[in-house]
């Protein structure tokens, strides 16, 4: 009973962070299962495992996207690492609003249940994660499935907005003495920018899906041309949220990678201020490029020219970050421990994803590539090998701090190599499929595409072996037989750590700081 009360009513940022991690792991496993079902269906031409039920295929696609985005990456990155480490890194005793933190988490399980219900009632919600009308309208999806998905989004959106308010307040008001804004660790900066993006973009999504809800149930015509509405309005509203959302997913990863590259190169991050302002620029520009998802809906040519140019400009701050990471490693004594492997893998694969993004930014090219597997390849390189690699990197980097036990290094490296090989084998062939015109979200395809699809499906099976490896690592780390206690700083940073988390014991006390730490200097590494 005491344990139940501790976890149910917890107001401790570390406990809530741990809950977010557990939740993210569960949702991630579900999302992975759906993705494997998708790849099994696409392994060869013709109907494979779904018996010709093509609506079910689209339900799988939709559920896979929602699970991975709203219930895996966001809870783990912002809720997990954010809650665990933002207060510690800024020298705060806890979050600004501990009970708000609790409700932010507990809104997510009901939201997840609503999402799963939407896949299970009637014929499910086969709209894709974009939920475009008229397909999501009452005529095309007559049951309650889409309504359940909308309520699910509302709940997880409220959760994220409350969490954002909490992070913004905490970072602005609860920094320890001497912790100026320009001394904040980069992970804290990344969470701050992310919180602002969430706060500004989610209300727009809420408005769009509420209008969709009334269109479906109360006979309004916001998105119905018959009553003077316009389905393109929905697309504008959705992508005004949807584009900042993809930066919300990757920015905390940028912060994690900066910490890891710095630690394992044995030198401070190259161009700290440049890194900070690059993240802020990405955040601002992220709101100015949404219509590049809509080049095929008949936008004016001048509009397309603007969105092409603006999208390419986002590559500049992103490039600054990539080159700063490389410059940080340049001339350092690099240790290739598991977190560093994932970080280097992140930089390499995220760069490939970014380059295909530059290709897609060209409105002329995008008209040919829109809704093909080229787009799927692009955003999976950014997410499946960007956000997810950053999550794994952060896990291996901080797992000793969180649990107070060290992970098995060899097994961690095996996990990295299997995953690296698997995800590349899955998503690289998709570029070729897209360039030869294979459309997204279609469960069958001409025989000409069979070769690359077979390879891609094989890669996804390898990735699953990698995930299993990861859970073996977690099990071994947490098992009672693991006597390898973790030092306050497992990466030997006691003398020259530039961040606070390595100054406290592993795991940190229930109340991290007996007295607030005073920060004198954050830049120098003692050699």
UniProtKB/Swiss-Prot annotation:
Annotated binding of Cu cation, by residue: 243, 292-293
InterPro entries on file: Cyt_c_oxase-like_su1_dom, Cyt_c_oxase-like_su1_sf, Cyt_C_Oxase_1, Cyt_c_Oxase_su1_BS, Cyt_c_oxase_su1_dom, Cyt_c_oxidase_su1_bac
Pathway terms, separated by semicolons: Energy metabolism; oxidative phosphorylation
Residues holding heme a3: 378
Protein's recorded name: Cytochrome c oxidase subunit 1
Signal sequence bounds: none
MF-aspect GO terms: cytochrome-c oxidase activity; heme binding; metal ion binding
Gene3D superfamilies referenced in this protein's UniProt entry, alphabetically: Cytochrome c oxidase-like, subunit I domain
Coiled-coil regions listed: none
Quaternary structure and partners: Component of the cytochrome c oxidase (complex IV, CIV), a multisubunit enzyme composed of a catalytic core of 3 subunits and several supernumerary subunits. The complex exists as a monomer or a dimer and forms supercomplexes (SCs) in the inner mitochondrial membrane with ubiquinol-cytochrome c oxidoreductase (cytochrome b-c1 complex, complex III, CIII).
Gene Ontology terms describing biological process: electron transport coupled proton transport; oxidative phosphorylation
Pfam families from the UniProt entry: COX1
Family from the record: Belongs to the heme-copper respiratory oxidase family.
GO cellular component, one term: mitochondrial inner membrane
Cross-link type 1'-histidyl-3'-tyrosine (His-Tyr), residue numbers: 243-247
UniProt organism field: Arabidopsis thaliana
Transmembrane segments: 18-38, 66-86, 103-123, 148-168, 186-206, 237-257, 269-289, 312-332, 340-360, 379-399, 414-434, 458-478
